[in-house]
From Swiss-Prot:
Its main location: plastid. Heme b 1 binds at H100, H202. It comes from the Eukaryota. The keyword Electron transport applies. Keywords: Chloroplast, Electron transport, Heme, Iron, Membrane, Metal-binding, Photosynthesis, Plastid, Thylakoid, Transmembrane, Transmembrane helix, Transport. GO terms for biological process: photosynthesis; respiratory electron transport chain. One of its GO terms (cellular component) is chloroplast thylakoid membrane. This is Cytochrome b6. The gene is petB. It holds the Pfam family Cytochrome_B. Binds 2 heme b groups non-covalently with two histidine residues as axial ligands. Component of the cytochrome b6-f complex, which mediates electron transfer between photosystem II (PSII) and photosystem I (PSI), cyclic electron flow around PSI, and state transitions. It comes from Pisum sativum (Garden pea). It is found in: Plastid, Chloroplast thylakoid membrane.
Length: 215
């Protein structure tokens, strides 16, 4: 085993990387409230794992979406647990994100030189809200359908581009299969990818600049 480790160590300098990670200075004022961002990340990872598991059973069509969700909840092995954990972690992620934003704002973590860290955090907040909107529609029940109708109609109030945006969101003149397909693609591919990229940027900037001062 040591020979395998030595082989990788010679090429990748694993020990130097580990030393850099474990030797980072943690200020004495850091407390449990500084863990809210990490908890948000944990919730996101749980979402990815449980969401991936449900893609094996979910069918993104207006005729089969609701039935496939019912199958997950009633017949698939541990499907009810996986979907419940997905929903609970979604709620927890939103709550932890809101508390994290308040903590950062109250401690002045958005000030120079951490403006870009704050900007990436705001983008992550918007992505999280979009996760909620797109995920809410996927069961394609009455609540999900009318939620989509409401959300896709909101941009109509925007001057000049409002009508074009309304047609862009549902991907057709009315809410239907094209809308569900688009929301499913956003929820399972586009949003997770963007969130992962911005989370990486967010954490790298925190790593570089360190944690802001005490409350």
């Amino acid at each position: 085993m040591s020979k395998v480790y030595d082989w990788f160590e010679e090429r990748l300098e694993i020990q130097a990387i580990a030393d850099d990670i474990t030797s980072k200075y943690v200020p004495p004022h850091v407390n449990i409230f500084y863990c809210l961002g990490g908890i948000t990340l944990t919730c996101f990872l749980v979402q990815v794992a449980t969401g991936f598991a449900m893609t094996f059973y979910y069918r993104p069509t207006v005729t089969e979406a609701f039935a496939s969700v019912q199958y997950i909840m009633t017949e698939a092995n541990f499907g009810w647990l996986i979907r419940s954990v997905h929903r609970w972690s979604a709620s927890m992620m939103v709550l932890m994100m809101i508390l994290h934003v308040f903590r950062v704002y109250l401690t002045g973590g958005f000030k120079k030189p951490r403006e870009l860290t704050w900007v990436t955090g705001v983008v992550l907040g918007v992505l999280t809200a979009t996760f909620g909107v797109t995920g809410y529609s996927l069961p394609w029940d009455q609540i999900g359908y009318w939620a989509v109708k409401f959300v896709t109609g909101v941009p109509d109030a925007i001057p000049v581009i409002g009508s074009s945006x309304v047609e862009l969101l549902p991907a057709s003149a009315s809410v239907g299969q094209s809308t569900l397909t688009r929301f499913y693609s956003l929820h399972t591919f586009v949003l997770p990818l963007l969130t992962a990229v911005f989370m990486l940027m967010h954490f790298l900037m925190i790593r570089k600049q360190g944690i802001f001062g005490p409350l």
